[in-house]
């Protein structure tokens, strides 16, 4: 094989490997928490960050609701 063909095959394998690595780390988990009082957005966000780290996102279910939903990386 010529040098150009070998380099082209190497680049294809490298790019495919990087794409596969990127898509594997994007799995998200959800944690549904119910309370006794109506959900408040800032408290929901703070609780999610406390439980799952700074990358977690918290949001209240459609209002009025007593449920908070945390979304975070499953790998964390």
Curated annotation (Swiss-Prot):
UniProt signal peptide: 1-25
Disulfide-bonded cysteines: 29-74, 39-60, 44-68, 48-70
InterPro entries named among the record's database cross-references: DEFL
One GO location term (cellular component): extracellular region
Annotated TM spans: none
Family: Belongs to the DEFL family.
Protein name (record): Defensin-like protein 122
Name of the gene: LCR30
